[in-house]
Amino acid sequence: MSKIHHIPKGYNSVTPYLVVKGAAKAIEYYKNVFGATEVMRMAGPDGRVGHAELQIGDSRIMLADENPSMGNRSAESIGGSPVSLYVYLPDCDKVVALSLIHI
């Protein structure tokens, strides 16, 4: 019998899930600035992102558009966030330059 690993392939022990306003725009930003690869995206009939997954280096993040009817609100909607993400990249100067271009 094969052993089932408790962490799915491509994931780490902790995987952040971001709720944002304008998830499609955020995905493009993460691709352009951090070199993220889009693993998958599920869009609703209105085009809003219901769920998406990105790979940045060896880490996966999940994100979706805010959906207040389900209790999911973005930091913008609640006036800030108690959460920070630390992203380790080999060339910080390049990332800063890209972030200024794609802001």
Language-model features: where?
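Conserved small/polar residues in nucleotide/adenosyl-binding loops
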Residues: 101-103
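Vicinal oxygen chelate
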Residues: 13-21, 50-55, 72-98
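Core segments of cupin and vicinal oxygen chelate
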Residues: 8-10, 17-61, 66-67
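A detector for short, charged/polar N-terminal pre-domain segments
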Residues: 1-12, 73-75
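General secondary-structure propensity
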Residues: 1-2, 65, 88
